[in-house]
Swiss-Prot record:
InterPro entries: Cyclotide, Cyclotide_sf
Alphabetical list of Pfam families matching this protein: Cyclotide
Lineage: Eukaryota, Viridiplantae, Streptophyta, Embryophyta, Tracheophyta
SUPFAM superfamilies, per the entry: Cyclotides
GO BP, sorted A to Z: defense response
Keyword set includes Transferase: no
Function: Probably participates in a plant defense mechanism.
Name of the protein in question: Cyclotide vodo I3
This protein's UniProt keywords: Disulfide bond, Knottin, Plant defense
Family statement: Belongs to the cyclotide family. Bracelet subfamily.
Free-text description of this protein's post-translational modifications in UniProt: This is a cyclic peptide.
Keyword Metal-binding among UniProt keywords: no
Length: 28
């Protein structure tokens, strides 16, 4: 649930442990 500070491109996030939700990267 914490924003990782980047949008996700092609449904992937460059920051480990983060997942793409609604166009943005979140972790927990």
């Amino acid at each position: 649930g914490v924003f990782c500070g980047e949008p996700c491109i092609k449904a992937s996030c460059s920051i480990p442990g983060c997942e793409c939700i609604a166009g943005l990267c979140y972790k927990n």
